[in-house]
Amino acid sequence: MAFPTTSAQQAETNRKILEEIQTKKQLLAGGIINLGLSPPNQMPAPQLLGQPTTVNPDFQAGVGIATNATSTARSAFNPTSSTTLGFFIPQDSYFGNSFIPVLPRLEPLPSPATTPTTPNAPPSHSISK
């Protein structure tokens, strides 16, 4: 019989699973897994409105991206961070949000009620008796 028996297949599958678990335990114990946190000196400076956004080469190369980020997230990170006014902080998340957006604060536009009026303007309504 050329095919392995089902018990041999099950034993092989179990062995592979146990090896994978052991490898993950060693990585966690050794602190090798990157949590996606970067030191504050690697954070890009916030940009002002109207100025082109420049990306830190480490972030553009994917160094700041968490190692467990999917390839889709990595491919979305680079173009997005180079075309936005803000920047993104990579993080390790179990909920799928691998990047936190950081947007600049904008000054509020002046409201029409606070605009100065001319003193010689005619009154808009008159009172009649």
UniProtKB/Swiss-Prot annotation:
One of its GO terms (cellular component) is SOSS complex. One of its GO terms (biological process) is DNA repair. Residues 105-129 are annotated as: Disordered. It comes from the Eukaryota. Belongs to the SOSS-C family. PANTHER family: SOSS COMPLEX SUBUNIT C. This is SOSS complex subunit C homolog. It comes from Drosophila simulans (Fruit fly).
